Structures are given as C-alpha cells and as structure tokens.
Amino acid sequence: METIAKHRYARTSAQKARLVADLIRGKKVAQALEILTYTNKKASALVKKVLESAIANAEHNDGADIDDLKVAKIFVDEGPSMKRVMPRAKGRADRILKRTSHITVVVSDR
C-alpha cells in the first residue's frame, strides 16, 4: 500500500531540496529519518517533516506497520517564484527570485 504526503510551496529551491531527497530515496523509513536528522541542510528539516507526515498517514489511514515501510518515491518539483526587487547603485534595480518547491514523499510497505 502506497501512502503520500506533500508539502507545497516550501520556501527552498527545488535544486537544494533535491540534494537531500536523493539521500533517502529507496531507504527504510527508520534509516531515512536518521540520515535526515544528521544532515546539515535547511531542506533536510522540511523533507523530514514530510516523511514523518507520510509515516503517520500510513499508520493512521492504512494501518501499515512502520517497521515495513520504505521510501518508495520522493521527488521535488518547482513551485512558483516570488519576485522581489533589490536596489542597486546609480538608481538601478535587480530582480530577486525567491524560489519555492513542492516536496512529495511516497512510502510503501512493498
């Protein structure tokens, strides 16, 4: 049984979050949580929260045994970017893109 959890509009770039997602793809959830706990990245806290939500969904909604669960799929898609202006010298301005991402975690007992 596959169970899904999503975090939409996460305030991190998809490129940075994918580095963390690649670390836990295909691992058992206990091992994945341990890896995320000791990974020193902002995105690891966001991914860990989504993984914990997926585990809770599997246990509560599907009655799955936590010991059998593994990270079947994890992917990070780009969300919309917030456009901001950074004033520069001589009256110029640069556009700053504050990027967001959609983090999706699928856990499975198979």
From Swiss-Prot:
Q: What is this protein called?
A: Large ribosomal subunit protein uL22
Cited CDD domains: Ribosomal_L22
Q: Which Gene3D superfamilies match?
A: Ribosomal protein L22/L17
Gene Ontology molecular function: any one: rRNA binding
Q: Which UniProt keywords apply?
A: Ribonucleoprotein, Ribosomal protein, RNA-binding, rRNA-binding
In terms of InterPro entries, this protein maps to:
Ribosomal_uL22, Ribosomal_uL22_bac/chlpt-type, Ribosomal_uL22_bac/org-type, Ribosomal_uL22_CS, Ribosomal_uL22_sf
**Family listed:** Belongs to the universal ribosomal protein uL22 family.
Which cellular component appears as one GO term in the record? cytosolic large ribosomal subunit
- Pfam families under this entry? Ribosomal_L22
Q: List residues traversing the bilayer.
A: none
Q: What does this protein do?
A: This protein binds specifically to 23S rRNA; its binding is stimulated by other ribosomal proteins, e.g. L4, L17, and L20. It is important during the early stages of 50S assembly. It makes multiple contacts with different domains of the 23S rRNA in the assembled 50S subunit and ribosome.
Q: Which organism is it from?
A: Aggregatibacter actinomycetemcomitans (Actinobacillus actinomycetemcomitans)
* GO biological process per UniProt: translation
User: What does the subunit comment say?
Assistant: Part of the 50S ribosomal subunit.
KW Flavoprotein (keyword) present = no
